[in-house]
Amino acid sequence: MNALLLAINSKYIHTNLAVRYLKEYSRQQGIEGVDFVEYTINQHLPDIIDEVYRLRPQVLLLSCYIWNVDMMLDFAADYKQICPETLIVAGGPEVSYSSRQILEENPAIDMILSGEGEKPFVQLMQHLNGQRAIEDVRSLSYRCCGDIVENPWEEEIDLAELPFAYMDLSDLQHKIVYFESIRGCPFRCSYCLSSIIKTVRYMPLEQACAYLQIFLDAKVPQVKFVDRTFNCKKEHAMGIWKYLVEHDNGVTNFHFELTAHLIDEEMIAFLSTVRQGLFQFEIGVQSTNEDTIKEIRRATSTDKLLDICRRIDAAKNIHLHLDLIAGLPHEGLESFGRSFDRVMSIRPQQMQLGFLKILKGSYMAQMAESYGMIWSKKAPFQVYRSNWISYDEMLVLKAMEDMVETYYNSGLYDCAVKFCLDREVSDFAFFRDFGQFWRAHDFHRKSQSPEEKVTILRDFFLSRRKENTQLLPIFEQLCLYDICRHSRPKKLPDWLSTSKNLEYRSQINAFFDLPETIPTLLPEYSDEPEPKKVQKLAHLQVFSCDPHTLEARDTAILFNYRAPDLLGNAKETLVDIFR
């Protein structure tokens, strides 16, 4: 009997680890005829149905997550009408803790596999092939004689049994691949489903490194570890980090979720030596309100956490993501503002402002009503208000989040935004007010072009205080610098002048004609036939002030777009064309 595993990812660049595990593990256990397909939530449901139908699966397994569960259930309802004979099985975190309810409300779903899927999926296929009784399929919920039967859950798998999931890397050069070396989490944060898993299991270090070497050999751009707390066991974390440093291919970036208070002096010293761009860290702060931290059952010291983050960031070699969650118990708008300002004082490369979601099966779901929380009953189950924060205030934070994403996390306006923030009393107040400014002018009602976005930033900067008018020439040069870092300046706002390049046109042309310019400063363009061609692909910009020091003097910077850093910024060289 053939089976098709269906994944619907949130973005095209994402890949689904679970369906790959099931395919490879079942093959390892002698089950043939299992394959998977991947789509995204942006694709039309009829198109997905069309493609799946053409494959004629006898068994269809849906991989259900918070971002796709509604789409999966809609898919099942429609597909069942077309192919009533197809057995449709749902699995994944969004159905594991409400299997009875899902089966009661969705007649198109025939069965549900709860929890870890590797062993139960093999058992289900053995049952469908006549090799096992249905009562012996662990973690399975199904209908029988007008009732719903829920079999006992399977024991947790030994991670040494896990196969390498990405057997075909040929079509993944422009996608993110995921890797798992740990299951479970030693902490019990009330909002997180990982707190339900009682044990922490580790893949043997030698096995993990052997699997990671496959990614290194293929030079995939990024590997994201899905381990909830990668550094919960120092020997495991350091073993993998040291292996990746010793076998660094100069290309692949590795993303880890860490708990900062477990990072000790030895780890900090080691991390300060790694290649810039090799590692990327995501550290959950969630809140700096001590009452909130205690209520959500986080075991951390905020002061220690932030100090370690600063020390990691000080080396300037690791891309740092810090997270906050809005809507947590005991955290009102003012308290959230204080949390935001404390975290932003580190100036992380990414400031991820999330909103509390009430996940089925979590401790937060048990407590939510006592907190006065109102939340969406459909995915993503986001909180609207609580005893501590109103819906109006959550809307303020939502508008603010859009500004943080657009102007801070995008990295497109780094220097201009930093210039603004350096003149503010509170980063929170800046982004909060920017969000209200954006909505007051109805900018949220239509998409904005890049030149429109930078113009809106300029207008908001001018609206903040009168003295900003005097700073406008510097601010505008920083906007131009931000644009040049990411691409050649083409379509610019009317207020943004590049007159300096006209003034120094002959010097710029002479610079590109120098025989040493391309081989020395732009070797990535050596295959181009002539300097004029290179001049149109790379870029030399003359600024009326130094973008780094803000000193008022003509400054020439060469931008190499074929040697970008991890954030997509062009390689820069300060050049002297003025002699």
Identify the residue ranges that each predicted region occupies.
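N-terminal [4Fe-4S]-dependent radical SAM core
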Residues: 1-3, 137, 141-178, 564, ...
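Internal alpha/beta domain cores that form substrate/cofactor-binding pockets in large enzymes
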Residues: 2-7, 24-55, 59-60, 67-86, ...
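Radical SAM enzyme core and accessory elements
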Residues: 2-6, 45, 49, 58, ...
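A short, glycine/small-residue-rich beta-strand->loop->alpha-helix junction that serves as a flexible
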Residues: 9-17, 64-69
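Glycine-rich beta-alpha loop elements in corrinoid/cobalamin-binding modules
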Residues: 25, 33-153
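Proline-aspartate-enriched helix->loop->beta-strand connector
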Residues: 56-60, 220, 348-349
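Radical SAM [4Fe-4S] cluster-binding motif and immediate context
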Residues: 160-314
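A structural motif corresponding to the C-terminal lobe/cap of the Radical SAM core domain
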Residues: 234, 246-249, 255-262, 266-430
